[in-house]
Amino acid sequence: MAAAEAEVVSPLIVDTAPDTSGTAEASVAASVAEAARTESQAPASKAALAAKLMSLSGVFAVHKPKGPTSAELLNRLKEKLLAEAGMPSPEWNKRQKQTLKVGHGGTLDSAAQGVLVVGIGRGTKMLTSMLSGSKRYITIGELGKATDTLDSTGKVTEEKPYDKITREDIEGILQKFTGNIMQVPPLYSALKKDGQRLSTLMKKGKVVEARPARPVTVHSISLLKFQPPFFTLDVECGGGFYIRSLVSDIGKELSSCASVLELTRTKQGPFTLAQHALPEDRWTIDDIEQSLERCTSLLPEELTFKKLKSDNSSDQVISCGYITLRDTKREDDAVKTL
């Protein structure tokens, strides 16, 4: 009986609704239907991504390449996340006093690369705790050449012989730069005078006096490679330490001069370049969410955002400028929030 009914119904269906599959009309209808489905689903998907993005809190690490400043990299990260979530531009958000709050702790020079610790949401409140922690660097120094910036980006100010310097000579003086020592910071730095960075004043041709030596800590230094005029060091140090000053001082101690050719931060606090720093192609909401779980779990419990008092109103307002630790005023001891 069912078969008979099917035979009766089938002709009726064919007669009243002719098969248009494969025709132009069918293709147009399918495209319109798909567009309608996509349009109805997209806002919901973007809204969910935006909600997830604004709920993120904690600290994670990114891989800063050579070229951009730490602040420029932070802006690039922020723009990528806002674009993925379909949120308005940062400029619009500033006017509305609602924005994604991100910050970094521990500046890297534009010519340097490596681990940059980033805080997001309430995680920006944890960044000051990262400043006094240990950092590790691999640097390549060049003997016989001094520059005004103490690295390869500057103007050559002095050249001296280096041909008699041996590996043993370098290894023999490293102990002098280990432990609690005094260090004079570079003139080209983020340290300030009358509210302006020393580097900005130098670029304007202003006369800037050398800053006094200040106490810093070096946990360890080892010479990895020596191929004159280049030498490679592995340095673990505390906050406020300048690798550029170290390399320059080593050159002077060897009766020559030296400047930094390359600088890579391989570790900051518990975060390493190899295991934790996200490259730019992984700056996505999902990747950062996973990284937050992994990285925040490495911090001492008293530093996690779960222990911080929540202030939802302040979390939604952009905070610009530097927050400086009370007991010091060093370039690395500043938290940049955007």
Curated annotation (Swiss-Prot):
MF terms in GO: pre-miRNA binding; pseudouridine synthase activity; tRNA pseudouridine(55) synthase activity
NCBIfam families noted in UniProt: TruB
Protein task: Pseudouridine synthase that catalyzes pseudouridylation of mRNAs and tRNAs. Mediates pseudouridylation of mRNAs with the consensus sequence 5'-GUUCNANNC-3', harboring a stem-loop structure. Constitutes the major pseudouridine synthase acting on mRNAs. Also catalyzes pseudouridylation of some tRNAs, including synthesis of pseudouridine(55) from uracil-55, in the psi GC loop of a subset of tRNAs. Promotes the processing of pri-let-7 microRNAs (pri-miRNAs) independently of its RNA pseudouridylate synthase activity.
Catalytic activity: a uridine in mRNA = a pseudouridine in mRNA; a uridine in tRNA = a pseudouridine in tRNA; uridine(55) in tRNA = pseudouridine(55) in tRNA
Keywords recorded for this protein, A-Z: Acetylation, Cytoplasm, Isomerase, mRNA processing, Nucleus, tRNA processing
Active site, per annotation: D109 (nucleophile)
Name of the protein described by the UniProt record: Pseudouridylate synthase TRUB1
GO cellular component: cytosol; nucleus
Location of N-acetylalanine modifications: A2
Top enzyme class: isomerase
PANTHER family xref list: PSEUDOURIDYLATE SYNTHASE TRUB1, TRNA-PSEUDOURIDINE SYNTHASE
Protein's cellular compartments: Nucleus; Cytoplasm, Cytosol
Family to which this protein belongs: Belongs to the pseudouridine synthase TruB family.
BP GO annotations: mRNA processing; mRNA pseudouridine synthesis; positive regulation of pre-miRNA processing; tRNA modification
Stored Pfam families: TruB_N
Organism of derivation: Mus musculus
